[in-house]
Amino acid sequence: MASFGTRFPKSRLQVLSASSSGFFNSSHLQKPKLNHPITFSAHIFRTMASALTLQSKQKLNNGLEIPVLGYGLWKTAPEEAEEVTTEALKVGYRHVDSAASYRNEAGAGAAIRGAKDIPRSELFFTSKVRYINYDDAKDQVEETLEKTGLAYINLMLLHCPYGGSEGRKGAWKALVEAQEAGLVKSIGVSNYGVHHLDELETHIKELEEERGGKGKGGAINVAQYEIHPWCARNDIVQWLQKRNVAIEAYSPLVRGERWGDKTLKALADKHGKSEAQILLRWSLQKGYIPLPKSVTPTRILDNTKIYDFQLSDEDVKNLETDEYSPVCWDPTVSPLDGPKSG
């Protein structure tokens, strides 16, 4: 199969090659008229919660940065995606989370391209590979670039740990190659259990040997999971934090299924906030990157109003539970020889 570079039209290669000569930092790209963003590395982030703003970023283990609040597009209709993403960008989000399986990458890309007053360097776009094997992962990177019209993808994740060991290793190799080619800036996984993560570390070491040395196997920059007080995933979180991997939390609002919970409601009343805002603040103070989803303009805005209050340590502790109650699919528990596709 041809290399990543040879499969793209010349115009895209010209754009990508410009990055090595300072394209993304050139003087004509002006910073938005916002307060200077506060940047934290993952290992100190949780202790700095009081300093958070909508412009805050977390430093990844590859030196790049990710906005600490994302706008999720799960189950957003393709025909709505551009409009709602544009609305999210208008109210201050700078981080958009999509996936091949969501079928709304094109709308997200159109909104990002249409945000003429926001430099591309200030916008963070994520997508995910659905079919976990080398060829499909390689093709998915190219398809996402074509559908979105973007010159690069900020973050590409393997959506689930399906595909078998050979498929997972091959898909990861494809992401590493895409990162090396400049098509993808950061890479990672979603819904991997500890056993899948352990296997991936082995694959990374194998790829280093096969591809010519340390660093050639890539590194997990970001990992994404359903995380909230009723699905804490402490074993996975500990594994990732030990390696300074940024953790994203999807379904941080538990699909609204916990509205009216006694503790949650009490905290909302105490702080004069909505239950959704309490859950998002909990996620931020745990050091996670929450990805709330809404297509309602008022809720899109309300989900950003989480920086003018702080939960106490006791609040955070009281909200946590011993429950394991995911509201979405849960591939983290699938065996290493599990399904070949999602």
Feature names for model-found ranges:
Residues 138-158, 177-181, 213-215:
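CE4/NodB-like, metal-dependent polysaccharide N-deacetylase domain
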Residues 77-87, 134-147:
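Short, acidic/polar
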Residues 120-133, 155-161, 224-227:
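A short, structured active-site edge motif that brings together acidic residues
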Residues 2-4, 13, 43-122, 174, ...:
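N-terminal binding-site loop/beta-alpha segment at the start of enzyme catalytic domains
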Residues 160-342:
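Beta/alpha (TIM)-barrel catalytic core signal, keyed to glycine-rich beta->alpha loops juxtaposed to Asp/Glu
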Residues 1-23:
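N-terminal chloroplast transit peptides
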Residues 109-120, 145-150, 204, 237-242:
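Acidic (Asp/Glu)-rich catalytic clusters
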Residues 94, 151-154, 185, 221:
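Short acidic/polar active-site loop segments enriched in Thr and Asp
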